Amino acid sequence: MVSPKDGKRYPTDVASTEVLLRIIQSVPSPKAEPFKLWLAQVGRERIEETIDPELTIERALETYLKKGYTREWINQRLQAIQVRKELTDEWQDRGVEKGLEYAILTDEITRAWSGMSTRQYKRLKGLKKENLRDNMSTTEIILNMLAETSAKDISKKEKPEGFEENRKVARRGGNVASIARQALEAETGDSVITSQNAVQLNRVVTQAIEAISKSDEN
């Protein structure tokens, strides 16, 4: 790490999230107790979700509501999660490796339908570690779902073998959504791709609700 005082580099201790949580668990200080209780709660909830998967959906719904998302958006997002799961299951059946290969295929799909790589898309929305899908508009989510479910359906039909064949299928799935995007943009005259992120999108929704409420009052 570079010191702001003399500009020299010095070794710095760093820890992953897992290591950091283990450190917190080992701290004897009473000040660490709230964190330990929180970790215990999260662990209990994770075990409950393993026993009853429906709890995962219910808690995801609650989390999105607390963040200010509309129910319409949440319904689309939860459906998108299911579509994504079906796609990754298909990739697994086709021998695609989790991690890097999943990321590359996802990038191919995103680039094919949106015209941007995942990194470029996140940069457009001012995102860093945040989930791109959590910062999409409803229309963006729907088109991304169309791209992913198209890739899954083509894969099930053609049963591609090897990474490169799956890569071609991913592009074709993305192209299906690209055609839909271009058709919609031709009808509306507006770009489907927006630079707005979750905070900005929620603000727009809030302002619209307030405007409707004032109109009803008048």
Could you say what each language-model-derived stretch is?
Residues 1-10:
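Basic, Lys/Arg-rich DNA-contacting stretches centered on the C-terminal catalytic core
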